[in-house]
Amino acid sequence: MSAESLLHNTFSTEQIEVLENEYAAHNYHPLPVCFSKAKGAKVWDPEGREYLDFLSAYSAVNQGHCHPKIIEALVEQAQRVTLSSRAFYNDKFGPFAKYITEYFGYEMVIPMNTGAEAVETACKLARLWGYKAKKIPTDEAIILSCVDNFHGRTMGIISMSTDPDARDNYGPYLPNVGPKISGADRVLRYNNIEDLKYYLDTFGPKVAAFLVEPIQGEAGVMVPDDGYLEEAYKLCKAHNVLFIADEVQTGVARTGKMLCIEHSNVKPDVVILGKAISGGVYPVSAVLSSREIMLNFEPGTHGSTYGGNPLGAAVSIAALEVVKEEKLTERAAVLGEKFRTALIECKSPIVQKVRGRGLLNAVVIDESKTNGRTAWDLCLIMRSRGVLAKPTHGNIIRFSPPLVITEEDLMKGIEVIKKSLNDLPTIDMTPYAEKPIH
């Protein structure tokens, strides 16, 4: 089959599944639905079936799929210049750097492409600062993170992970990073201020940074107790440790604040952004910090061929403008409250908990009451009824629709979720089961 026919033929969902299973590594287990077209909060498969997207590419399309303003910026810039590398200046990165730093209230930015790259960049920056400013002995800097974190999948980042799926069989791991440091008598648990106090009291002079998610998304939308992040920040300041907020999934209005950390009235020393800063049309990420911290980077000490490219810069400016112009922060706060209230009030016996902030929410399924059915089965039922979501960590389903979703569509989605919850323990799963791929 020629490249032209592969690109322009219309394949069925089943054909797409076969092609992907045959030619792509099996490092994902997708829900059996294929996106062929998308607009706003809706997607369509090759057969023309319409769905409400309640995942938003893990919060990358906060502004909705194929937002016209963002697509226009992409097309216009793609026709002018797409890549210069940082070997030269381009006429979009400088304006983007000014725009994003003023937008989030920081002094300097270093641009990257993916969330994981931005996390790695922030960790390198923290180590640089630790050696050059804090005077930590060479090769002894520590970066702390929490149990059940998710910051990405690079070798450096999985050294911090406690998730067996992300970590196992990839060793050996980097020392001095993560929730368990050699010589400690405990792990550093999320939402446990005593654990952080222990680590800073024990290792403080060698700790460069504490890296934390304001809400642990992949762990099941774990919202910390009120006061936890404030106290964590104060402890970091007392020990001269950088407080780094990973806002790749939680940032850009998703939780009803521009940055999720704003719920805690904390301004981190370093903020990591990705996903929705480019509206889901081009990979862009960024690390924001003060001039004093950022200037520890010198020419040649870090870089990225694509980081700061004019195409990504133009797209990101448009994407961030959309957030403010369409008041997506306020929409997320209002619609998120309606979502949680509706699911709590339905009083489903199989729902253990509903939690979240803004339009980043999770429903915990009590699989002891579902007659052997699982959260995955529930997602298959919802898919057949036009709502797309996916489990995280087994019995937890994350719901995070685009922030542009109308209230009418949100309520339609909620009704599908409620009916599917009601039907799960007794429904015949045969029509919903995944077909084997040959």
Curated annotation (Swiss-Prot):
<dbReference type="InterPro" id="IPR015421">
    <property type="entry name" value="PyrdxlP-dep_Trfase_major"/>
</dbReference>
<feature type="modified residue" description="N6-(pyridoxal phosphate)lysine">
    <location>
        <position position="275"/>
    </location>
</feature>
<dbReference type="GO" id="GO:0019544">
    <property type="term" value="P:arginine catabolic process to glutamate"/>
</dbReference>
<comment type="pathway">
    <text>Amino-acid biosynthesis; L-proline biosynthesis; L-glutamate 5-semialdehyde from L-ornithine: step 1/1.</text>
</comment>
<keyword id="KW-0663">Pyridoxal phosphate</keyword>
<dbReference type="Pfam" id="PF00202">
    <property type="entry name" value="Aminotran_3"/>
</dbReference>
<comment type="similarity">
    <text>Belongs to the class-III pyridoxal-phosphate-dependent aminotransferase family.</text>
</comment>
<dbReference type="InterPro" id="IPR015422">
    <property type="entry name" value="PyrdxlP-dep_Trfase_small"/>
</dbReference>
<keyword id="KW-0808">Transferase</keyword>
<dbReference type="GO" id="GO:0042802">
    <property type="term" value="F:identical protein binding"/>
</dbReference>
<dbReference type="GO" id="GO:0005737">
    <property type="term" value="C:cytoplasm"/>
</dbReference>
<dbReference type="GO" id="GO:0010121">
    <property type="term" value="P:arginine catabolic process to proline via ornithine"/>
</dbReference>
<keyword id="KW-0032">Aminotransferase</keyword>
<dbReference type="InterPro" id="IPR005814">
    <property type="entry name" value="Aminotrans_3"/>
</dbReference>
<dbReference type="InterPro" id="IPR015424">
    <property type="entry name" value="PyrdxlP-dep_Trfase"/>
</dbReference>
<protein>
    <recommendedName>
        <fullName>Ornithine aminotransferase car2</fullName>
        <ecNumber>2.6.1.13</ecNumber>
    </recommendedName>
</protein>
<dbReference type="GO" id="GO:0005829">
    <property type="term" value="C:cytosol"/>
</dbReference>
<dbReference type="InterPro" id="IPR049704">
    <property type="entry name" value="Aminotrans_3_PPA_site"/>
</dbReference>
<dbReference type="InterPro" id="IPR010164">
    <property type="entry name" value="Orn_aminotrans"/>
</dbReference>
<dbReference type="GO" id="GO:0005634">
    <property type="term" value="C:nucleus"/>
</dbReference>
<dbReference type="GO" id="GO:0030170">
    <property type="term" value="F:pyridoxal phosphate binding"/>
</dbReference>
<dbReference type="GO" id="GO:0004587">
    <property type="term" value="F:ornithine aminotransferase activity"/>
</dbReference>
<dbReference type="GO" id="GO:0055129">
    <property type="term" value="P:L-proline biosynthetic process"/>
</dbReference>
<dbReference type="InterPro" id="IPR050103">
    <property type="entry name" value="Class-III_PLP-dep_AT"/>
</dbReference>
<keyword id="KW-0963">Cytoplasm</keyword>
<keyword id="KW-0539">Nucleus</keyword>
